[in-house]
Amino acid sequence: MSAPESISKNPGRYVWFTTLYNARAYYPILAILFLDLGLTLDQYVMLNLVWAATIFLFEVPSGALADTLGRKTLLVTASVLMVMEMSCLLFAPKDGGWVLFSLCVANRFLSGLSEAAASGADEALAYDSLPQGDREQAWDDVLGKAMRYRAAGFVYAMIIGGLLYDPSIVNRVLPESFAISATFAHRLPVGIVLIQALVCLVITLRMVEPVKTHEEGTWKACCKAVSLTLETAKWVFTHRATRTVVVIGLSIDAVVRNFATITSSYYRLIGLPEWTYGFYGAFIGLAGFVVPAIAAKLNKRFGTLANLGFAAGLALVGLSGIIPGNSKWCLAPAMLLMMTMGFLGFTVSRSLNRESDSARRATVLSVKGLAFNLAYGSFSLGFSRLLASHPGGSGDAALRNALLWQVPLFAIVTGGLLMWGKWQFGKVRAA
């Protein structure tokens, strides 16, 4: 088989890899999965700090490794790490004390490491495998197909994960003699994702490296990547427009994303049946088709700061609405918060792409991702300490208390930053 023929299947393999890698059935029940294993909510939130810190530390070196060791090598590594992270969860002992917590920490570390390894390497390998003649149009087609497959996979995974987690639903379709326990049902979504991880490993092993991208050594490439990232970070945070967008954006994203990771715990708090969680996740996924269109219209009509203010306002309404946590009506503001993430992401990305020149655009977006993960991890740490400090422990009362106290903090910080942003943009216009 000639080289062009051998790499021609890479784009199709990329589509299947990115779908199976990202559409995970445990997403709609992620928080309660850890809680039902025996962790407290503050321990679970602390695990998110481990995940965010791992990505923060390894995102940049992984890009250099992909360029020196090869994109296929990084993707195979990401798949192996995915198998390991799922195995940690699948075999973690319920109420297992320090053994359970250690395996959960390992799961979050391996998950962050896997995502850092896969980040960008899959797209780069698929793009380089396309014919050079009409590569741009061909990539649009591949990317469009990948987005459709991911969206469909996400909806399917959300629904299946929520249904399988509830033993009462599973036992309705099984003969009485095959009835399963709640403990077994809770492992089913994890087992499905473990199978997906094994399929991802097979797919990546069958990929073909298009070209040897770099001749320089790995250490030199890592140093070069870190140097470029630091140089770009300096530009981002000294350039008024980009600095303002990133700082305001991360202040909103950190709080909203923290809630996104505990949604299943919140759904349980307001009394929603577990089997419905996946349908809410699927609804949010489908809303992702609508939110970008709304965001595009508002960003064309109003300035960046106005749209950031709109995102902050939506987030404040949502955060205020979820405080009671005692009624199914609290689901509406929770859904609003989830959709705010999409609007914020569109606004920040559009602004940074406009402000950055093509030579540094990819690194600017990478710096944005690093800054957002650092802020998210820091807020997760504070939120977990707030939960743990509650006199009654980290139960329902502690969660309601934490949800209450984050609202004035969010209002003060984002309000102050928006006023600072108005001053910064005023200086940009005056320059």
Residue ranges and their predicted role:
Residues 13-30, 47-64, 73, 103-168, ...:
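Substrate-agnostic recognition of the 12-TM MFS/MFS-like secondary transporter fold
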Residues 68-79, 299-313:
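Cytoplasmic membrane-interface "Motif A"-like loop-to-helix N-cap segments
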Residues 80-98, 104, 313-326:
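C-terminal ends and interior cores of transmembrane alpha-helices
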Residues 165-195, 385-414:
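A membrane-interface helix-boundary motif in multi-pass transporters
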Residues 170, 182-186, 190-220, 419-431:
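Helix-loop junctions on the cytosolic side of multi-pass membrane transporters
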Residues 305-348:
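C-terminal transmembrane helical hairpin of 12-TM major facilitator-type secondary transporters
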